[in-house]
A protein has these predicted regions:
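Generic structural signal for helix capping and beta-alpha/helix-loop junctions
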Residues: 153-154, 197-200, 248-250, 273
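Generic beta-strand/beta-sheet core signal
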Residues: 123, 147-149, 191, 216-217, ...
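Glycine-rich adenosine-cofactor-binding loop
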Residues: 110-153
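A structured beta-alpha segment of the ubiquitous adenosine-cofactor-binding alpha/beta core
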Residues: 176-212, 217-221
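Beta1-alpha1 glycine-rich phosphate/pyrophosphate-binding loop at the start
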Residues: 32-46, 133, 148-161
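Glycine-rich phosphate-binding loop and adjoining beta1-alpha1-beta2 segment
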Residues: 149-185
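Glycine-rich phosphate/adenylate-binding loop
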Residues: 1-90, 206-213, 217-384
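A short, basic/flexible loop-to-alpha-helix module at the beginning of a structural domain
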Residues: 92-120
């Protein structure tokens, strides 16, 4: 390969550098390396093995005792590690522990050894689900089940974490690539269908009791009722993040098993308490024929504000059994929370009048058990 070397103020070549994981640096079986060269910095970023198919071919790695190539980039095994060269000149190598380096900035805030054991089952991988997945990946969650039947289209891009290069693929596949780009060690299972049809063996493999949370992101009450019931079966928590017209407001509901909480079906399954957009009508994120409705889709910043509050609750719930963890919101928000982006009727209509001011987050709403439950969730009483 040919490269352009960066120069300093005096026109001198800036030293070239290789970034590579400790695992790869000491891999004596390595024969080729893939990644990317950045000509503005003079850095060769050797991609982890799990992402090698996304990188450009950088060069070969030769056996111990070999003479470095006089032309281009190569590596030579020396004792128990690879030394890198550019046209025969040895290059500075900076190795890193992949997991430790990626999550080093979380130290003291989140315990990475705790977070890597957690699993998130994300139902709906659109604008909400994609943000949830990306932030949990950054927080160190290492196990995912992604469930969505939709294909990423161009009208999704302005509100989705994936981009134009992903258009045409299933949302679950596109999102899996994004997660692995943050943590190549993540274990991500995908299902290109609705939660009601997901094979049980996928969840049996991935869901660990009290270490798993199901996240309803599809604005579909039927799916949320079903997902909460499955979560209870696996002794897993459940949270739903949904939106009202134009995403001027949203609602967040969570259920933690064996905490004497009403499940989603009891609390919100009928839809009587909320102005949330009903099942399968993704008006806030995916509506294509905008002129056929009375309001417009919500913009990304409104969707993300409410979703971020839900993500904080997810992280709190996943760490609720960790004695050293300090909750951000869980001790202050009720099981059912409303969040508004604006209190202007010109955007939200008459329903917006229930909010006193913009960015209001409720802390006093209470939901109860349904008529089929006498003070305890009937789903939790069912035999597994």
């Amino acid at each position: 390969m040919e490269i352009k070397r960066p120069k300093n103020f005096f026109g001198e070549d800036i030293p070239l550098t290789v970034f590579i994981s400790e695992e790869q640096l000491h891999n004596k079986e390595c024969i080729k390396v893939y990644g990317k060269y950045f000509e503005d910095t003079g850095i060769f970023n050797v991609f982890p093995n799990e992402l090698s198919d996304r990188g450009e071919y950088l060069g070969d790695v030769f056996p111990e005792g070999s003479t470095p190539s006089a032309n281009g980039f190569c590596g030579v095994i020396n004792n128990d590690e690879i030394e890198f060269y550019w046209s025969g000149e040895k290059i500075v190598t900076e190795s890193y522990g992949l997991y430790q380096s990626i999550f080093s900035r979380n130290k003291g805030i989140l315990e990475t050894d705790v977070m890597k054991k957690k699993c998130a089952v994300i139902i709906g991988c659109g604008s909400v689900g994609s943000l949830v997945a990306m932030e949990l990946a950054r927080a160190g969650v290492e196990k995912y089940v992604l469930c969505d039947a939709d294909t990423l289209e161009y009208h999704n891009v302005c509100r989705h974490q994936c981009g134009i290069e992903d258009v045409g693929d299933l949302k679950v596949n596109a999102l899996k690539r994004k997660i692995l780009n943050i943590n190549p060690k993540a274990n991500v299972k995908t299902f290109g269908g609705i939660i009601q049809n997901i094979p049980k063996e996928i969840l049996d493999e991935m869901c660990t009791p009290y270490e798993t949370i199901f996240v309803g992101c599809g604005d579909n009450r039927t799916a949320d009722v079903y997902a909460n019931k499955i979560a209870i079966y696996f002794d897993a928590a459940f949270i739903s993040i949904g939106f009202w017209e134009r995403a001027y407001a949203g609602e967040i509901f969570y259920h933690i098993p064996h905490k004497n909480m009403p499940c989603y079906k009891c609390a919100l399954g009928s839809g009587d308490l909320s102005g949330r957009v009903e099942a399968n009508h993704h008006i806030y994120s995916n509506q294509e024929d905008v002129e056929s409705v009375k309001f417009e889709p919500g913009i990304s910043v409104d969707i993300n504000f409410i979703t971020s509050i839900g993500i904080k609750l997810i992280i709190d719930i996943l760490n609720s059994t960790n004695e050293g963890y300090i909750p951000r919101l869980l001790n202050n928000l009720k099981q059912y929370t409303l969040v508004c982006n604006t209190s202007d009727p010109a955007i939200g209509g008459e329903m917006v009048e229930i909010f006193s001011y913009p960015l209001q987050v409720t802390t006093s709403l209470v939901v109860g058990f349904g008529k089929d439950c006498s003070g305890e969730c009937s789903y939790e009483l069912e035999e597994k």
